[in-house]
A protein has these predicted regions:
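N-terminal Sec-pathway targeting helices
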Residues: 1-14
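Prokaryotic Sec-type signal peptides and long signal-anchor helices
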Residues: 9-12, 26, 507
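Membrane-interface motif at the C-terminal end of an N-terminal transmembrane signal
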Residues: 19-39
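A compositional/structural signature for long, glycine/proline-rich flexible linkers
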Residues: 34-531
C-alpha cells in the first residue's frame, strides 16, 4: 500500500510540476484568440440587457470582467415556454434579495454579463435551478436561525460548502420538519398548496452529533470559519418568481447567552469576505489550457475523443475528473469516489460527455426517461412519491474553468416528446447545424451547443453535455447513484444510461424524417461504424 501511495504521490508531483511549467508558458503566450473559429451570435443576454449589467460582449462572446477575467460568454438560448428565467421575469427576480441573501445568480446573460460578478453562476448550473448564495461566519457558541415558508416548487435544498466548492452538509425539502400548526408540502399525502407552511432551520458550527437534532445544517468547520451555503430552487410553479412565491428566509443570530440579533445586525455579526461576491473558479483556465497542450492531447479538440456511439460517463469528483481527462491511466480509477465537487450537492448525481465539432457537428442523446413529478402548472395534489426521481435534465455547457452553462431541457419539457418505448431524443448542435427535424413537432428536444470552451485562446470546437438525477427514489436502482465503477455506466443503469450518438452532419439526422424514426436511431451505431 505504501508503495502504491508513493508511486501515486510521485506521479502527482510530476504532473503538478509539468502542469505548472506549462501554465507559466501558456500565460506568457496569452493572447485574445476569441474570434478564431468561433461563431458570432447576436444575443448574449435578454433584449433589455441583464439587470445587474456588465460588459457588452463582442460578436463572438468575448468579454473582460470587472476583476480582469477574460471569457467567451455562451450565446443566449431560445426562450422556451417552461423557462424559469425569461425576459419578463429577470428584473423582478433580481430585486428579491436581502443583506444575507444577495439575490439570484445563474449562467451569464441572465442576471449579468460580468464573469467576475456575483450574478454569474460559474459552476455549470442547471438553468431550471436558481441559486442564491450566502457567505457567513458563525461566532463561537452561536447559531444562525432561518425562518420562512416552504416554496411552491419542484425541489428545494440548502447545502454548505468550503471556500473551494466541496459540499459539506445539506438538508432537503422533505427532511425539514414544519413549525407547529404548519405542514410540509413536499411530504407524502400533503397538498402542495397547503397553508400554513412555515419552517425553522438552524445552522451550527462543527460536525453533527451522533444523535442529530432536526432541521439543523452543519458547517463541518470551526467557529468563525468562512462558510458558503447555496439555497437551490428548482422549477417554481409557473415560474412566478425564482423563490416559488414566498419570501427569502429571515435570518437571526442566536448566541449561547440568549441574545438574538436580527436583520442588518445579524448580517453584520456574520459578515464574510465572499458575501455578495463571485466564488473562485474551480479550475484555473491557464492550467486547463496548459494541460490541453500535453503531448498526447490535441489542443484544438480538447478532452473529447472520436466515437460513433457511447454512453455518458459518471462524474465522481473533481480530482478524478481532471486525472481522467488529461491522464487517462487506469490506476487512477481508485480515486473514483462519489464525493462531488464544482459546488455539487448530495441530492444529485451527474453524467457527462465531452464533445468536439472536430469529430461531429450533430449529436443525439437517447435513453429511457425516468418517471418524475409534474409540477410546472401548480398541480395542488400531493407530490407523487411513486416516481423514480424528483428531477431530471440534460444541459450543454462550456469547459470547467469557465463553468458556464449554455442551454438546458428538463423532464416536463421532454416527456411529451417521448417515443412509444418511453425513450427521449435530445439533439445538440449549433443553431446553424440544427437539423430541420430537431423540433418538438418531430418528437425531439434540441440544445444549443455554444461557441467552445469559453476560454480566449482555447478551443472553439469544445462541447460538453451533462445529465442530472436529483432526489432519487431509493427503490429506483438505475440512476447515476448506482454507478460505482468507471466504465460500468450501462451495466449499472441499463436503458436509463443516456447513449450519445454522433450523426456528424445534420443531413444524417434529417433523413430520419418527421416524426423522427427513433427505431432507426437505435440501430444507427452499427450502421455508422461500417461507413
Amino acid at each position: 500500500m505504501k508503495k502504491v501511495f508513493y508511486t501515486f504521490a510521485g506521479t502527482v508531483g510530476v504532473i503538478a510540476a509539468l502542469g505548472g511549467s506549462l501554465a507559466v508558458w501558456v500565460s506568457s503566450q496569452g493572447r485574445d484568440d476569441g474570434a478564431t473559429g468561433r461563431p458570432s451570435y447576436g444575443a448574449y443576454t435578454f433584449p433589455k440587457g441583464a439587470p445587474r449589467g456588465g460588459p457588452i460582449p463582442r460578436a463572438d462572446g468575448y468579454v473582460e470582467g470587472s476583476q480582469g477575467s477574460k471569457f467567451i460568454l455562451p450565446v443566449m438560448p431560445p426562450e422556451r415556454a417552461m423557462d424559469v428565467h425569461t425576459a419578463g421575469s429577470v428584473v423582478r427576480n433580481n430585486e428579491i434579495r436581502t443583506c444575507f441573501w444577495p439575490g439570484p445568480k445563474l449562467r451569464p446573460g441572465f442576471y449579468s454579463t460580468d464573469p467576475d460578478g456575483y450574478g454569474v453562476e460559474n459552476q455549470l448550473p442547471d438553468t431550471m435551478n436558481t441559486f442564491t448564495t450566502a457567505w457567513f461566519r458563525i461566532p463561537e457558541g452561536a447559531q444562525i436561525v432561518m425562518k420562512g415558508e416552504y416554496p411552491h416548487e419542484r425541489h428545494w435544498s440548502f447545502t454548505t460548502y468550503s471556500t473551494n466548492g466541496v459540499p459539506r452538509d445539506s438538508i432537503d425539502d422533505v427532511q425539514i420538519d414544519p413549525d407547529s400548526g404548519s405542514q410540509n408540502p413536499f411530504r407524502e399525502g400533503v397538498r402542495r398548496d397547503v397553508m400554513p407552511r412555515r419552517y425553522t432551520i438552524s445552522i451550527a458550527n462543527g460536525e453533527p452529533p451522533a444523535v442529530r437534532p432536526p432541521n439543523t445544517v452543519y458547517t463541518l468547520a470551526p467557529a468563525s470559519a468562512e462558510v458558503g451555503m447555496h439555497m437551490r430552487n428548482y422549477v417554481p410553479d409557473r415560474s412566478i418568481d425564482y423563490l416559488g412565491a414566498v419570501s427569502l428566509p429571515e435570518v437571526e443570530l442566536h448566541y449561547a447567552d440568549g441574545r438574538v440579533l436580527k436583520g442588518e445586525d445579524a448580517c453584520s455579526a456574520t459578515a464574510a469576505p465572499l458575501r455578495g461576491k463571485q466564488v473562485p473558479l474551480a479550475v484555473n483556465p491557464k492550467v486547463w489550457q496548459a494541460l490541453t497542450k500535453l503531448p498526447w492531447m490535441n489542443p484544438a479538440v480538447g478532452p473529447a475523443h472520436a466515437f460513433e456511439s457511447e454512453p455518458m460517463e459518471m462524474f465522481f469528483n473533481r480530482e478524478y475528473l481532471m486525472l481522467k481527462t488529461f491522464f487517462p491511466i487506469r490506476a487512477f480509477d481508485n480515486f473514483a469516489v462519489q464525493k462531488g465537487g464544482f459546488w455539487s450537492n448530495r441530492s444529485t448525481r451527474y453524467g457527462y460527455k465531452y464533445l468536439s465539432q472536430e469529430h461531429g457537428k450533430v449529436y443525439a442523446m437517447r435513453g429511457k426517461m425516468p418517471r418524475t413529478p409534474r409540477t410546472w402548472d401548480g398541480n395542488p395534489s400531493p407530490v407523487s412519491q411513486d416516481v423514480d426521481m424528483r428531477y431530471w435534465s440534460i444541459c450543454s455547457a462550456m469547459a470547467p474553468p469557465t463553468g458556464m452553462t449554455v442551454d438546458c431541457v428538463f423532464d416536463e419539457g421532454v416527456v411529451p416528446l417521448l417515443d412509444e418505448k418511453g425513450y427521449f431524443t435530445v439533439v445538440v448542435s449549433r443553431a446553424g447545424d440544427r437539423p430541420a427535424n430537431a423540433t418538438e413537432k418531430c418528437g425531439v428536444a434540441w440544445l444549443e451547443w455554444g461557441n467552445g470552451d469559453g476560454i480566449p485562446g482555447g478551443s472553439s470546437d469544445y462541447g460538453l453535455i451533462i445529465n442530472r438525477h436529483t432526489t432519487v427514489n431509493p427503490q429506483f436502482k438505475y440512476s447515476w447513484f448506482a454507478v460505482t465503477t468507471p466504465g460500468r455506466e450501462t451495466s449499472a443503469m441499463g436503458a436509463y444510461a443516456p447513449q450519445v450518438i454522433n450523426f456528424h452532419e445534420k443531413q444524417r439526422f434529417e433523413a430520419l424524417g418527421c416524426p423522427v424514426d427513433t427505431a432507426k436511431i437505435d440501430k444507427m451505431p452499427a450502421q455508422l461504424a461500417v461507413q
